[in-house]
Regions:
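Carbohydrate-associated surface elements
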Residues: 116, 134
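Acidic anion/phosphate-binding donor-loop and adjacent secondary structure
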Residues: 122, 135-151
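Conserved donor-binding/catalytic core segment of Leloir-type glycosyltransferases
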Residues: 154-172, 178-181
Length: 328
């Protein structure tokens, strides 16, 4: 089976596309598919001609488009059936939502990485599946916490919270974590029982291996986002058994299940004036941090990822079943 993956050209990535697109393609190859890529550069409509040329040369059985705008390019060619995956960015802007979801009605099948993305789409595909992106388990190498800290030069006596993004990414909502940590550190009852300092570390400009090592070294992975698709970094933190705290968004509740070492915070809705936390959310975050930082152990998150069939290998098999249903 020949699959042509279509996505937007990204200048700041080694393969010029988002890592999970490349990794999904590699997993499909490992499962027996022949995979090639087409990257949309510039205008989405003007890219249709180049895509048709690529299709005639490669002769794929399926064109698989990632993200709604790339799907516009894919769905305007009429040579090969299209599968479209929505990753969440399509729902954040109403113009993009309208155009992406409208064009997705032309696709043979739509994959939403989480149910809420379909719920938020203006036009909802009838032929669809909920299939999150998978985790490259072979890269999720577990290093003992003490050893990981030695490699990073982290203080063994401090509490480290790994923030799931860059501090300046408003959607990731670092102000909530920052303010909660400061409030916790100022709490005399906490200081009485915890003499160690708390350090927040951002995930910015890091390789996959560098991120994984920090997940192994951290006491807690924090993702207080306002919006996510099916958060990859969170799944990766779980895959190395790092305790996690996240807002109740996307598929977080389903990911955590009833496993210990995972904490869920209600989603503090942003207003036009403020993206940071209201007092209720802040107090809740402080209480959850207090509990999470006292946990000190590791989780069974890796086993949870496997049970939920969220490894790249497992996800590839589910996607191939979608392809087969179209070709047959």
């Amino acid at each position: 089976m020949k699959i042509l993956e279509v996505s937007r050209y990204k200048n700041n990535f080694a393969d010029h596309q988002l890592p999970f697109v490349t990794e999904q393609g590699e997993a499909l190859r490992d499962a027996g598919c022949e995979v090639d890529y087409f990257l949309v550069r510039g205008n989405y409509l003007k890219a249709v001609k180049a895509l048709k040329e690529k299709i005639r040369a490669f002769k794929p059985d399926i064109v698989h488009a990632h993200f709604g705008l790339s799907a516009i390019t894919a769905e305007l060619q009429s040579l090969v059936p299209v599968v479209t995956t929505f990753h969440n960015g399509e729902t954040l802007n109403w113009h993009v939502n309208f155009m992406s979801s409208l064009m997705s009605l032309r696709a043979k099948h739509v994959i939403y990485v989480a149910q809420h993305i379909r719920d938020l789409s203006y036009f909802k595909a009838r032929n669809y599946s909920i299939i999150p992106c998978g985790v490259p388990m072979e890269q999720m190498i577990i290093t003992p916490k003490e050893e990981a800290r030695k490699q990073l030069g982290w203080d063994a006596n401090k509490k480290y919270i790994l923030f799931g993004g860059a501090f300046n990414n408003l959607r990731k909502n670092y102000p909530l974590l920052r303010d909660a940590v400061e409030k916790l550190k100022a709490d005399s009852s906490y200081i009485k029982h915890q003499t160690s300092d708390i350090v927040c570390v951002e995930m910015k400009g890091l390789s996959r291996a560098e991120c994984v090592l920090r997940m192994c070294a951290a006491d807690l992975f924090a993702l207080p986002s306002h919006s996510e698709g099916s958060p990859q970094a969170l799944k990766e933190a779980m895959a190395v058994n790092c305790p996690c705290i996240a807002t109740d968004i996307a598929d977080v509740r389903e990911l955590f299940g009833e496993e210990t070492g995972h904490w869920i915070l209600r989603n503090p809705r942003p207003t036009k004036e403020r993206w940071d936390a209201d007092e209720r959310s802040l107090d809740e975050m402080v209480n959850l941090l207090r509990e999470a930082l006292a946990f000190e152990g590791r989780t069974n998150g890796r086993e949870r990822i496997i049970v939920m069939q969220l490894t790249n290998e497992q996800v590839a098999k589910r996607i191939i079943r979608v392809y087969e249903s179209i070709i047959q």
